[in-house]
Structures are given as structure tokens and as C-alpha cells.
Swiss-Prot record:
Disulfide bonds: none annotated. This is Inosose dehydratase. InterPro entries: IolE, IolE/MocC, IolE/XylAMocC-like, Xyl_isomerase-like_sf, Xyl_isomerase-like_TIM-brl. It is an enzyme of class 4 (lyase). SUPFAM superfamilies: Xylose isomerase-like. It comes from the Bacteria. Keywords: Cobalt, Lyase, Manganese. PANTHER family: HYDROXYPYRUVATE ISOMERASE, INOSOSE DEHYDRATASE.
Length: 298
């Protein structure tokens, strides 16, 4: 399964140190994090809050361990701030990733987002964009796509819990109204299943737009509890709603089969934020690596 060297396996540092809740994994160093990634058998990663931003220092640390940068998250505010503000921050982010050799830029709209709010009920208070906000988002993403293309890069949109692009309908509209040459999709199994979507339907419908994949599993009993007890996104993460592939409810075999059949090329990034004091990140990275090897041969 998968053409040789066409798909690379990475892992996100958020399992070691959490960007939204820095107290989770606060004691874990950057060096420990990337050393354990490499030791677990991964060849790449995304960027966390403890990573040095000096590209020479970062390149050396990663190359010693055989790692490279797959991408990094960018928070857009296209619906809530002037475009120029997002564009300036985006260009700096783009240039950093370009220097690190990445080909795609993860973008998520954070206007009205509740994902970083500790007390806001995730499902009851989910933001919904107005028509005016949709127009700003679509136009802004197309323009960010143009800025990415200046460096031969692509933006991949990250649908995410607690944001205006979370559900199947919202993803469908985003894909329908953005320019396919300028805006691609980041496919995240965990966010779809947690939201209550049919992740295979979304995969098959938009498979030709997918340029980046996050492999994330869901503990369904925790997901149900989040709905019932009106928990926030951050409370859900602390409660363990997400875990690594093979440790939750999702069967990844049909996901891999569909992406293989479509000739997917790019990164698979294991991204499973949970409390490292409860779920040892190295142990869970090893679990994920073994499951992926057994399930699709990578």
C-alpha cells in the first residue's frame, strides 16, 4: 500500500507539550520531544511552542535525529480582523516553513473560535458564520493561497472542533466555494468523528482536495460525555477524548485504502493531544507507529 517514498510519517509535538494548555507537558523539553519522535520511528513532525524559531538551530536539531518539518498550524482571523493583519502574519509563517522545507501550510480560521476557551460548552456554543463572514473567509483563503503559491507552497484548511468550519456541511461549502487551485484540505479523522460526522463520506467526497492528513483516534465514551456534560474543547482534551490511531473507535484501514487508491502523496501526521502525565507520549508514539505499520505497511 502506497507508492514507495510518496507518503511520509510524521507526528505532532502536541502529544508531548500542548500549545493551547502549556501546563500539559510543561516539564518536557524540546530535545526530549524530538528525540522520542525519532526513536519511535517517525521521520517528520509539525511545530510546537518549544521549538526554536531560528531555522539554523532548528534544522540542526532535527537533522541530527533524521526529522524534517511537515507543516505548522497558522491561526487566520479573516472573519474578524482586516485581511492585511492576517496576511502579514501569514507571510512570516510561510517564509519560516519554506526555509524548513515544508510544502504545505496548515490554516484554520479562528474568528469566533471557542477552541481555546476553558469553560465554553463545545457543542452548545459552536460558532456559525454569517453570510458576510463566509464571504470574507472564502476571499481571504483564496488570497492566502496566492501568497503560498509565491513560494511554490499550498495552504491546507484544517476543519476543527469549536470553529466555524467543523461539520460536513461547512466543509462541503468551503470546498465548493474556494478555488481548488488555491485552497486544499487537511483531513483530520479525529475532529470529524468527534463532531459526529461520517469521516469516510468526507474523505471520499473531497479526496482530490486533500494534501495533508492528521491521524487522530477518538475515545467515543469520552466524546459522548463531552456532549452530555456540556464540556469545552480543552476540557475534552484533558479528559482524553483524543488518542493515537489504534487506541480508539476509528478503523483506519478504509481510510488508508481510499487514500492509497487515490494516489495520495504527502504526509500522514499522528496528532493526538492528550495529557502526557496520563498518556506517556513516547509509549503512545510507539503504539501509533506499530498500528500504522500493521494496518497499511508504512
Amino acid at each position: 500500500m502506497f507508492k514507495e517514498n510518496k507518503v511520509k510519517l510524521g507526528i505532532a509535538p502536541i502529544g508531548w507539550t500542548n500549545d493551547d494548555m502549556p501546563e500539559l507537558g510543561g516539564e518536557i523539553t524540546f530535545e526530549q520531544c524530538i528525540s522520542e519522535m525519532a526513536l519511535a520511528g517517525f521521520v517528520g513532525c509539525e511545530v510546537g511552542n518549544k521549538y526554536p524559531r531560528d531555522t539554523k538551530i532548528l534544522k540542526k536539531a532535527l537533522s541530527l535525529r533524521g526529522l524534517s518539518i511537515a507543516s505548522a498550524w497558522f491561526s487566520a482571523f479573516l472573519t474578524s480582523k482586516p485581511f492585511e493583519e492576517t496576511a502579514e502574519a501569514f507571510k512570516a509563517h510561510r517564509d519560516f516553513l519554506y526555509e524548513m522545507g515544508a510544502k504545505v501550510i496548515v490554516v484554520s480560521e479562528q474568528g469566533n473560535s471557542i477552541q481555546g476557551q476553558m469553560e465554553t460548552p463545545l457543542f452548545d456554543k459552536k460558532p456559525v458564520f454569517t453570510e458576510e463572514e463566509w464571504d470574507l473567509l472564502i476571499d481571504g483563503l483564496n488570497r492566502l493561497g496566492d501568497l503560498a503559491a509565491e513560494k511554490g507552497m499550498n495552504i491546507v484548511y484544517h476543519h476543527h472542533m469549536g470553529t466555524g468550519i467543523q461539520t460536513t456541511e461547512e466543509i462541503d461549502r468551503l470546498m465548493e466555494e474556494t478555488d481548488p487551485k488555491k485552497v486544499s484540505l487537511l483531513y483530520d479523522t479525529g475532529h470529524l468523528v468527534f463532531s459526529g460526522e461520517d469521516h469516510l463520506h468526507v474523505l471520499n467526497k473531497h479526496i482530490n482536495r486533500i494534501r495533508h492528513v492528521h491521524l487522530k483516534d477518538v475515545r467515543i465514551e469520552v466524546a459522548n460525555k463531552v456532549r452530555e456534560e456540556k464540556m469545552s474543547f480543552l476540557q475534552a482534551v484533558k479528559a482524553g477524548v483524543f488518542t493515537v490511531p489504534g487506541d480508539g473507535v476509528i478503523d483506519f484501514k478504509p481510510v488508508f485504502e481510499a487514500l492509497d487508491a487515490a494516489g495520495y502523496e504527502g504526509w500522514f501526521v499522528v496528532e493526538a493531544e492528550q495529557d502526557p502525565a496520563i498518556a506517556n507520549p513516547f509509549e503512545y508514539a510507539l503504539k501509533a507507529r506499530q498500528y500504522i505499520r500493521e494496518t497499511c505497511g508504512l
